Amino acid sequence: GSPVVLEKADELGLLYLEEPGAFHSAGHDPFIRTIVNTKLQRMILRDRSHPSLVIYNLINEWGGPRARDKELTALRMEDMKKAHTIDPSRVMTFTSGWASAEHSEEDAKANLLPFDSVLHRKGWFDNHRAAGPATWEEDYYRGPKDNLMYTDNRTEIYLRGEEGALSTPPRIAEIAKEIEQTGIKGWDGLFWKNQYEAFQQFFHEKNLAPYFGSIDSLTRAMGDVSFDHQGRRIQGMRMQNTGDVYAVNGWEAMPYDNHSGIVDIYRNCKGNPSTFTYYTQPLYVAVSPRTQFVHLPGKVPVDFYIVNEKNLSGKYRLSVSVCTPDGKEGKHIEKEVHITGGDCFGQLLLENCHLAIEGASGLYQVKAQLRNTSGHLCAEGKDEVLGIYWDEKQLKGKGALYGTPDDPVATFYQKATGCELPAFRSDMEKLDWIVVTRSSLDAPQPVPVEAFCQKEGKSVLELSLYKDDDLRTLAGVTQDNKIDRTFADGA
């Protein structure tokens, strides 16, 4: 927490959660415990007059050996109760992340409510899903009760406290322009300048200008992948009227070790803001296809929801149309729906509606409009479905797959042709085509022995193995002169 940030949040009407920092690092040592508690209490005294501040949280992602120390956990709960007396008007939570079950009492859900001195171990559910994947996957929505954002938890405050750390590049051209115009390099300016030069070289070598126009257009297009993914998660939570808090992971990208973020380190929006803000509208129709690919001609099942923060209620007419890749639009369905309104901010309007998709291959747009009894347009929405026309005659010639052993492309090929799709090898005879579904960068790269040089000049790799996630309990040390180990799901 920072007073200058909270002052601005007060002006803008933003709500903030605040943490003291480093609280989890304090063990049983009385001196360190005094330091972190003093820091916590001073933070509360300093910031409690800010109306934008609504939650105090002690620890981000409580875990590791200290989380298994029941005596230490009990001490921390007492710290929390004492701090709550300084400002009983706010919610105070023990940790963010790692709640597991709705009806169980858990330390991970410990909370103190406003003007309530009782420590509750249920009623506050926060679980983090920060890891990717890199793109939205169609498996993330298969129906009203089969989707990534679904929950039947209706008894607790429900948070998704860290969602989707999706990697996208910074607006490197804009950063380079700002450094050039201001002459201010700072501590990292040369890093960004060198990265921009590398982008320029890649852009020209690959002749990307006819397709993307500029480096900035390219990086914004890549940023849109992340924005659309985050938006679809937010939409899923809102349209199902589930949950109370959604936190994008994260706001600002760190320069080296984590490239997720809405903005880069120079505060440039990484993608086009409209890609993200479509999903944050206060009122629209959420169009949710259960599959985003269809074999032409075919039918695609679609569910229609309303995101309703404008308190629409009563009878309305929902009309659905499909727009073909060449812009021709045809109405498919018109149906009367009833909207609840009030504190129902998301509602399923029409379920499992099968829409015929036929015509040329390309992107088909499913559109929905909601009108009142007077015919006035109140809300609308859209999504896209990729229509694909193919037959096995198109899969002629000799080919191979550069992918993983369980790649769905291989399964599809075998089902379509009755033949096995061989894995690519460098010693194969000339091929007509190759399907590539993985990066060449994940191929084994030999590390030269001289890279393992120790202080005394000996070329050897020293490997320390630990028993725990926090790298505190040493299991053993071994030496080798080459790296040839394979670890399931990474090291």
What are these regions (language model features)?
Residues 1-252, 257-264:
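Substrate-binding/catalytic cleft of secreted carbohydrate-active enzymes
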Residues 20-26, 427, 439-441, 465-468:
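Short, acidic/turn-prone active-site loops that include or flank metal/cofactor-
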Residues 299-339, 346-352, 362-372:
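Beta-strand-rich binding/interaction modules
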Residues 4-8, 412, 444-452:
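A short acidic, amphipathic alpha-helical/loop segment
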Residues 16, 92, 421, 459-460:
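Hydrophobic beta-strand scaffold residues
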Residues 234, 249-310, 316:
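Aromatic-rich peripheral "rim/lid" segments of glycoside hydrolase catalytic domains that contact
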Residues 361-369, 373-437, 464, 477-491:
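Aromatic-Pro/Gly-enriched surface loop or interdomain linker
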Residues 439-491:
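A glycine-rich, often tryptophan-bearing local segment used as a flexible ligand/cofactor-contacting loop or short
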